[in-house]
Amino acid sequence: LVKLGGKDDKNAVVLAAHMDTLGGMVCQIMDNGHLKLTNIGGMNPNNAEAENCKVYTKSGKVYDATFQLENASVHVNGEYSDTKRTYETMEAILDEPVKNKEDVKKLGIMTGDFVCFDPRTVVTESGYIKSRFLDDKFSTAILLGYAKYLKEKEIQTERTIYVLITSYEEVGHGGCAAIPDGVTEMISVDMGCVGKGLECDETMVSICAKDSMGPYDYQVVSGLIKAAQENDIAFAVDVLSLIHI
């Protein structure tokens, strides 16, 4: 939590984003030396099939692995295409000559070790950024850039502004405990959704009116809409019924 300054501490606003991301954790070392994983946050195994990953041990050593379906060769597995991808049917294969559980333990790998997946970050010639796990690193960068702008331009805002970067969003803890006295609004900056039934596209600001838990604050939503309209910012208001932000 960082205070950026401002003239009115009794009508302050918090701008929040989260820096935590999706991943996995070792939950079982199999007798054959393969690793069973459990998800951290909403990491979907369908999106991680055949992905390179790294196992981070408690001793600080890092080991490469691949997350794939059990019996992963289409040449020997007749049920390959029909098998549902879940954490029960998939496993991490270490890039180490391990044959059993004891071999894995000798490397220092144990249950509870975090597993990080390759983000596959690409910056195209046309300026597009493609990557896994941009949620919510982009928004964190935006808020840091805004703080830098205010400092360099020596801008004193009418309302006191706090920037809150949380590290618990993906596991549901939220950031309510860090709200200072005098704050009357909190605006969460997160990734917008694009898809069937939504108005937003990739060039717009996405304003969420309601998520799976209920409607958002009327005054805050109305204020965001008004600000976008007055500044000619392309935006869409959507209901995100499958997520809780």
Please tell me what each predicted stretch does.
Residues 1-243:
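N-terminal hydrophobic/helix-forming segments and targeting peptides
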